[in-house]
From Swiss-Prot:
PANTHER family: COBYRIC ACID SYNTHASE, DETHIOBIOTIN SYNTHETASE. Keywords: Cobalamin biosynthesis, Glutamine amidotransferase. InterPro entries: Class_I_gatase-like, CobQ/CobB/MinD/ParA_Nub-bd_dom, CobQ_GATase1, CobQ_N, CobQ_synth, GATase_3, P-loop_NTPase. The active site is at 332 (nucleophile), 435. NCBIfam families: cobQ (TIGR00313), PRK00784.1 (NF001989). HAMAP family: CobQ (MF_00028). This is Cobyric acid synthase. Belongs to the CobB/CobQ family. CobQ subfamily.
Amino acid sequence: MVEQIMIQGTASDAGKSILVAGLCRLFKNKGKRVVPFKSQNMSLNSFITATGDEMGRAQVFQAEAAGVFPDVRMNPVLLKPTNDRQSQVVFMGSILDNMDAVTYHDFKQTLISKIQAVYQSLADENDIIVLEGAGSPAEINLNDRDIVNMGMAKMVDAPVVLVADIDKGGVFASIYGTIMLLNEEESARIKGVIINKFRGDVALLQPGIDMIEELTKVPVIGVIPYANLKLEEEDSVSLSGKNYVPNSSALLDIAIICLPRISNFTDFHVLEIQPDISLRYIRNLAEFGNPDLVIIPGSKNTLEDMAFLEKSGLKKAIQHYAEKAGKVIGICGGYQMLGKKMLDPNQVESEQIEISGLGLLDTETIFLNQKRTTQITGVTLSGEPVEGYEIHMGQTKRGESTSPFCEIKAVNGNQETHQDGAVSTNKNIIGTYIHGIFDNDIFLGNLFNELLTLKNKTVYPHEIIQLKEHKEQEYDKLAALLEENIQMDQLEKIMKGEKICVSTQKPVIKE
């Protein structure tokens, strides 16, 4: 029979996704068949599986940590906000519809039996499932129809461990408040607490641990120290802490436009881990500076984000930068914005029908009702092998003054040839639909060398850090960190349904 543990949090960005990934790697290293599971994920960071199904990025990196291929069953429901009122609802990798919150709140009850069936299919194939909740289980206005926190735990009778982030302050209030807001049945499911992102001497924390255990009757089974692990961050909350000031000692300054509806910012994780590269996210004109490369990322609402560029003054700044031979790369929605105009006659993304783009590429985009979700392999026109994935509802037509960026050779593992993207005559403006383009080390190394040449500097002096190898190392570090700082014997008892005693829990943080 499958063993299971559910990680819920006191708030968003408490560390649930990372903790699930670490536990998946830890159990994998013990020889267990383990998979992650999140019934419903709200995110603009998504991935396309080998079968062309769309799922949340968090469950992808958790699957990588578990040593298994991403499977859409690990994230059956994906909600992709299109604006402040609506989300695109994706079930088992395919779009169902756009729904507002009230409509979806009623609709999701129809998904319960389907989610249970999906979960059972994973349970039949694995030894352990590590479940992840969303936000906080104490969203009491939504709990009557919850399918992702205590509602999910109840569906499969999973024990829960609550994780709380001490780095933001108020950790004991958040633990106590969360547990006290739950009804008796729900709070009884919480079998342990983990305090995350701790800095300092745990001896100073111990009196608080003793008090919270006495108040809640729930043991604290771990205190995880703050660790500077370089892992993907899925939650958009994490973007608020991203740097916008260039590092003057770095060889290259790369600026990413932080769009209000930015999607798939995980595309840029590989840039963050490269030595001598300053990567920053800019939100307004004052932060623009004089970068060596500007990247316009993907967007879940391209027309509204284009309007943001206009209103903020960033449109003119990017155009002026390009006129002075600056290098600009647009990914997916960013590619669409580089063109002359975008048309949305069916109002797929926005209430706007048409909007002018940056005009840096001779292209036009029309939005269609059908979404393209594919994994691809190909070769750039410069001869670099690339692979990645596409997620878009726009169809872009190139004009005569542009060249294609890439020749696609295979789609979802099947031979298929077509052209992707567009490149300006002077080669300084590049647009592509390929997410994960920077994960290709040959392409990335050549890009760095090109940018350094434009600055009259020598070639990039470092070997490109390959993302896959880097991730494997970080997953192992994460697993070791958890094993050292969580009372694993107590966690395993919880997973087996055994009762653990509050009075015996004395977590000791390891340096």
